[in-house]
Amino acid sequence: MRRTALRRPEGLDRYRILGKIGEGTYGMVFKAEAYASSSAAASSSSSGGTKAKDSGGSAAAGEEEEPMVFAIKLVKSHKEGKNDVVLSSATVREIKLLRELNHDNVVHLHDVHVDPREKTLALVFEYADHDLHDIVVQSKQKPLSEYTKKSLMYQILKGVDYMHDAWVMHRDMKPQNILVVGHGRKRGQVKLADFGLARLYKEPIKALSDVERVVVTLWYRAPELLLDAKHYTKAVDMWAAGCIFAEIVNGRELFCGKEVEGSKAPFQKDQLDKIFKVLGMPTPQTWEGMEHLPEYPQVVQMGRERKYPTQSELKNAVKFGAGRSGMALYDLISRMLEYDPEKRITAKEALEHEYFKQIEPEPRDWAFDEPGKEPVAFRTQTFVVTWRTTEWWSAVSFWDVFAGREPP
């Protein structure tokens, strides 16, 4: 695994706020650009920066380069006992992993800055205009071409394969955690993001379920996790990727179960019900060892309560299309949604699947720029706060906005 140096920043005064693009219990996310004096330094520290309004070629001699654009995540402190803690275990893990990971299809972490006075942590990432969820939602009005779908899928697999080769499980693969660059030379480039639940999995000292009992967002959670497997593998990421691929094809989620409110239990009956209705009921004959999983008796009871298909109905649930391409895509996603994690296809194997290697169109790294076609355009990310002018944002600091010390 190649290590990339992480510069110690002088502070966030090198960045100008363009707007706030997100807010949650974790804190806030801002879109920002580096001031001219900082752009060159940021560019030389990494190739992961995003140029604003980049039209494709490098700047001509004597021509000014556009400022680099970033997403800056300000993380709130939280209580652990009587102390205010800025660096949660998830944040520390994300920083450590992203310092080590270096791949075109994994989001790049440029800077880390801690403000002791504000008790706040700032993470400076490369900026992407969309997440995959945005693209899927917009595809209902603007259907994606076969080229765009295939190129998105292929890049996701490249990112997952790189992670797994580095002994990293993501454990929260979902469309919202997959970013897509929307402009410039990297239009349509995929970036796996949000590594807060990711972890190294080589030779774990203890059962992974002892560390975090529930991982992966419900709709993308593998059946072995729902049955409370104490030890699980990178195959959980491949199940999630299979759900995501079906979503790209269909324009909607595949398994939309309802989580028991307030429950932290791995077993979620409604989610398994949604899976069984599409893929059929697994048995110890088709999934070796499932009878030893803690929640297997619940599956037996579900089989007594209602009749599930004995064979997969996936062909009826996903619009695979006709011909050789449709059959190959069905085979690929079926192998990603294999119940038995030991039989589930790996990212490396999936990259060599005939759907990508033998059937046109050939997938590329720029999913929005299909050769010989007009470039695809999508609505870009909007700011959460829309009534502030650019001049207003320029006059305030990140910390002022974050702490509520905003000028009128």
Segments and roles (model prediction):
Residues L152-M153:
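Activation segment signature within eukaryotic-like protein kinase domains
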Residues L279-S334:
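C-terminal lobe substrate-recognition/regulatory segment of protein kinase catalytic domains
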Residues E118-D131:
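Conserved short submotifs of the Hanks-type protein kinase catalytic core
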